């Protein structure tokens, strides 16, 4: 094989039911900040994690919103500095985990996220605080990536931020935390994981290691997501979905994502879709055009997943989404014909769109979106 690639994955993974409640076995230092959303704090989950930290000093920041803003990052960083945090634990979906990555850096790097993000001129120099990520959904894979995505309220745009300092030291993947997910969240985060996997697989920067992980992740999701949706206490289905999400996260951490995620940013910011919904609503349409530059590879994937061809795979994915009451047409999310031009414009501004295995320009993206309006 003449393929040349690099693969970097420095995060220690602990994949075990119950591991989250023994996080103290992994923590270094005596002062810990646990970052979560309000629900995980109010329901007692965050405090239960804190109680398993072996008597260390624990502070909590529980104000993380979906699609977190830079202001939330700065507020959490202020809490971490006040606590003298030697360890930052991100607990939750991708929003909390992404915030934890930046906060762990801002403990020892002065200023605001705005100094380092977007138009900021500073570089994150080092990270002294330990970073542990504990996912409570099976979807984002953020526990094994070095990227965070944040909403800049000044511009109204949602933009990724990457740094080698964002790799978590430890990912504690405990599928029992997903047993109480609402059905809609199980569906949207699970299909987000499928997007991660297929975007890594068909990516113009794909590589053999990622292909292997992505293929396994896709098969696990197709075999388990409906069971997890219909029977939320099915431990094996939940475990398989957590595994799939993690594998997909590792895969796209190396390749980045493609057009699905590029177009999702304006759908989230302007139309209020969750990240998983914003990605999955265009998934079948992107599958249908994936043969343009990856015909042989996509046919191999269809064989692995048990489908005759790419159209059959696209239809099966759309049918699966419908069976979980997910939207598959843009008008169902409030998008009108006159909105498409702006969605296309923002999507094309994301560099990752050019990693899609098809020509991505104003005409082709407009046609794709109109096909699912």
Curated annotation (Swiss-Prot):
UniProt similarity note: Belongs to the iron-containing alcohol dehydrogenase family.
Coiled coil: none
Taxonomic superkingdom: Bacteria
Pfam families associated with the record: ADH_Fe_C, Fe-ADH
Gene3D superfamilies in the record: 3.40.50.1970, Dehydroquinate synthase-like - alpha domain
Protein name, entry field: Sulfoacetaldehyde reductase
Keywords for this protein: Carbohydrate metabolism, NAD, Oxidoreductase
Top enzyme category: oxidoreductase
Catalyzed reactions per annotation: 2-hydroxyethane-1-sulfonate + NAD(+) = sulfoacetaldehyde + NADH + H(+)
Known function: Part of the sulfo-TK pathway, a D-sulfoquinovose degradation pathway that produces 2-hydroxyethane-1-sulfonate (isethionate). Catalyzes the NADH-dependent reduction of sulfoacetaldehyde (SA) to 2-hydroxyethane-1-sulfonate (isethionate). Can also catalyze the reverse reaction, the formation of SA from isethionate in the presence of NAD(+).
Alphabetized InterPro entries for the sequence: ADH_Fe/GldA, ADH_Fe_C, ADH_Fe_CS, Alcohol_dehydrogenase_Fe
Protein species of origin: Clostridium sp. (strain MSTE9)
The EC number(s) this enzyme carries: 1.1.1.433
Transferase recorded as keyword: no
Gene Ontology terms for molecular function: alcohol dehydrogenase (NAD+) activity; metal ion binding
């Amino acid at each position: 094989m003449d393929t040349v690639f690099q693969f970097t994955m420095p995060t220690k993974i602990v994949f075990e039911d119950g591991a989250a409640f023994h996080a103290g076995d992994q923590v270094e230092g005596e002062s810990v900040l646990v970052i979560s959303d309000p629900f995980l704090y109010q329901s007692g989950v965050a405090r239960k994690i804190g109680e398993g930290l072996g008597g260390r000093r624990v502070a909590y920041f529980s104000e993380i919103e979906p699609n977190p803003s830079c202001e939330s990052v700065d507020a959490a960083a202020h809490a971490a500095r006040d606590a003298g945090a030697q360890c930052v634990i991100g607990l939750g979906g991708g929003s909390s985990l992404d915030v934890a990555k930046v906060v762990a850096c801002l403990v020892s790097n002065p200023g605001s996220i705005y100094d380092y993000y977007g138009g900021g001129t500073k570089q994150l120099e080092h990270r002294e605080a330990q970073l542990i990520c504990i996912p409570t959904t099976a979807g984002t894979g953020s526990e094994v990536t070095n990227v965070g995505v944040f909403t800049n309220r000044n511009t109204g745009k949602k933009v990724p931020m990457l740094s080698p300092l964002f790799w978590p030291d430890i990912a504690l993947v405990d599928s029992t935390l997903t047993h109480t997910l609402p059905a809609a969240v199980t569906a949207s985060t699970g299909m987000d994981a499928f997007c991660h996997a297929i975007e890594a697989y068909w990516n113009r920067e794909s590589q053999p290691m990622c292909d292997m992980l992505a293929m396994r992740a896709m098969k696990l999701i197709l075999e388990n997501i409906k069971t997890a949706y219909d029977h939320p206490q099915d431990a094996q289905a939940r475990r398989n979905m957590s595994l799939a999400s993690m594998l997909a996260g590792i895969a796209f951490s190396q390749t980045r994502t493609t057009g699905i995620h590029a177009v999702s940013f304006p759908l989230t910011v302007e139309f209020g879709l969750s990240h998983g919904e914003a990605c999955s609503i265009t998934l079948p349409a992107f599958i249908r055009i994936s043969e343009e530059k990856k015909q042989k590879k996509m046919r191999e994937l269809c064989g692995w997943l048990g489908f005759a061809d790419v159209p059959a795979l696209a239809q099966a994915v759309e049918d699966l989404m419908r069976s979980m009451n997910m939207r598959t047409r843009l008008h169902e999310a409030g998008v009108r014909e006159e909105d498409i031009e702006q969605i296309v414009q923002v999507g094309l501004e994301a560099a990752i769109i050019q990693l899609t295995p098809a020509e991505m320009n104003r005409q082709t993206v407009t046609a794709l979106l109109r096909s699912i309006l």
